Amino acid sequence: MPSRKSLLSACLAMLTAACATVPDALPPLELAPHVDLHRFMGDWYVIASIPTIFEDGVHNAKDTYELMPDGTIATTFTFNADAPDGPIKHYKSVGFVLAPDSNAVWGQQYLWPFKADYRISYVSPDYDVTVIARAKRDHVWIMARSPSMSDAQLARLTAFVAAQGYDTTKLKRVPQHVIP
């Protein structure tokens, strides 16, 4: 019968080997050179995304950012669940700027102590459209200040997302219904 010490050593060796086996590293994401946080604040409508499991079936999705006095960013994700007139849902989180030289890399905290990777990969000069990405290339959001975007502009941003290493066949258009 193996001793506790040998079992612990074997487990430690397997854990070390698992950590040492890293898949091919992805190249760094392109980031917005500088994000003016005051201009970035406000409402952003999600036009298309490679969604998280929590975003399946959303309509009228919108992120709202508010810069707080302590430098954190209060974030509210609002949407209608499962239908254009479905129940309104809200998720709140707190953003933390992790790269103050550019303000383009944030940690987004939905549950303490975990911070999700959140990178402003692109923001237009007029702060009208943005692309939010993640280093893992698992999720991405194309957002705009208004709930609509031309097909040509969406195609340009989709090409940008593809150039960042994303599988754009997973990109889904988010239904935005303007309700008077």
Task: Describe every region a protein language model picked out.
Residues 9-17:
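Bacterial N-terminal signal peptides
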Residues 19-180:
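A beta-rich soluble binding module of mature secreted/lumenal proteins
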Residues 1-8:
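Bacterial N-terminal signal peptides that target proteins for export
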